[in-house]
Amino acid sequence: MTGPRARAVGVISDTHGLLRPEAVVALRGVDAIVHAGDIGASDVLDRLGAIAPVTAVRGNNDRGAWAGKLPATEVLEIGGVLLYVLHDVKELALDPRAAGFGAVISGHSHQPRQEERDGVLFFNPGSAGPRRFKLPVALGRLSVEDGRVRGRILELLCRVAFHPTRVRSTGGQLQ
């Protein structure tokens, strides 16, 4: 007899109104989607909802009537594991391990990062929206199985360094 299958959770943040086609493709097949804020427009949530059920929190740049309906924090249970969602991890006002959480999901920094602290996965998928500085455009996927959470960061756009060829006046030859 086999146990329950792993649950796949797509994690996206800081779209700022831009839901890239690459993000839609990367989220296909997930059981649920978490948006960790700075959504930018309600239609982003509508489009994500066509892929899987969405849990979303309000980010510091989310404004308007639609955003006012979103909570600042959210708790969800996936495969027997509690996940705590907020936009800025610096505003975490509880001890996640003591509260029984398996993961804390956040955004805000635009920097993808995952680390385990005291048995709790802290997961920031980075920004899937407009590129900021030289940070990658990314999202994440969580796998929940047998009471454990594992994360993976998926970079959506290839970062290609551009090194222009130097042109000197040498009779039209590139050097």
Describe the predicted segments one by one:
Residues P21-E22, L94-A98, K134-L135, V160-R168:
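A short, polar/proline- and glycine-enriched secondary-structure boundary/capping micro-motif
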Residues W66-K90, C158:
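Metallo-beta-lactamase
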Residues D14, L48, L76, V85-H87, ...:
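Generic structural signal for conserved hydrophobic packing positions in ordered secondary structure
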Residues H16, I39-G40, N61-D62, V89, ...:
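Catalytic metal-binding/acid-base residues of hydrolase active sites
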Residues M1-V54, D62-P71, G80, L135-A138, ...:
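N-terminal active-site segment of His-dependent metallophosphoesterases
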